[in-house]
């Protein structure tokens, strides 16, 4: 415990805020190349085969990113755009792939929440 005199002389050191998505390096999105496309099983009590991809970013860092929506066209060597945002039931997955940009197609026949899945407006 410091004395009041020590606090006046030196003061307290600010606690540094840790980022939740360090691979983005303070950018909103980053481009990368898929090195592997695979499925993970979620934590208890959930059960599914969640689609994920290993992505080597332009910064040289390799991360695991979630592929949202039903169905995807991603393969190895596809160029993708990733954003921050973790998947609660997949440990270690802290990034999302943005649908409808670069080599990633939007979700087909999506009616609601289209902007989140890169789906075009359906013909009336």
Curated annotation (Swiss-Prot):
Gene3D superfamilies: Nucleic acid-binding proteins. PROSITE patterns: RIBOSOMAL_S12 (PS00055). The modification 3-methylthioaspartic acid is found at residue 89. Coiled coil: none annotated. InterPro entries: NA-bd_OB-fold, Ribosomal_uS12, Ribosomal_uS12_bac. One of its GO terms (molecular function) is tRNA binding. GO terms for biological process: response to antibiotic; translation. Changing residue 88 to R: Streptomycin resistant. Keywords: Antibiotic resistance, Methylation, Ribonucleoprotein, Ribosomal protein, RNA-binding, rRNA-binding, tRNA-binding. One of its GO terms (cellular component) is small ribosomal subunit. HAMAP family: Ribosomal_uS12_B (MF_00403_B). Belongs to the universal ribosomal protein uS12 family. Part of the 30S ribosomal subunit. Contacts proteins S8 and S17. May interact with IF1 in the 30S initiation complex. The streptomycin sensitive allele is dominant to the resistant allele in L.biflexa. With S4 and S5 plays an important role in translational accuracy. Interacts with and stabilizes bases of the 16S rRNA that are involved in tRNA selection in the A site and with the mRNA backbone. Located at the interface of the 30S and 50S subunits, it traverses the body of the 30S subunit contacting proteins on the other side and probably holding the rRNA structure together. The combined cluster of proteins S8, S12 and S17 appears to hold together the shoulder and platform of the 30S subunit. This is Small ribosomal subunit protein uS12. It comes from Leptospira biflexa serovar Patoc (strain Patoc 1 / ATCC 23582 / Paris).
């Amino acid at each position: 415990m410091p004395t009041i005199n020590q606090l006046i002389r030196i003061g307290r050191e600010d606690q540094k805020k840790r980022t939740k998505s360090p691979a983005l390096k303070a950018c909103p999105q980053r481009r990368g190349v898929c090195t592997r496309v695979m499925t993970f099983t979620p934590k208890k009590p959930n059960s599914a085969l969640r689609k994920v991809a290993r992505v080597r970013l332009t910064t040289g860092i390799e991360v695991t990113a979630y592929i949202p929506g039903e169905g995807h066209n991603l393969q190895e060597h596809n160029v993708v755009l990733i954003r921050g945002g973790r998947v609660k039931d997949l440990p270690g997955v802290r990034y999302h792939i943005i649908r409808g940009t670069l080599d990633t197609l939007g979700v087909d026949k999506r009616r609601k929440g289209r902007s989140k899945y890169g789906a075009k407006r359906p013909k009336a």
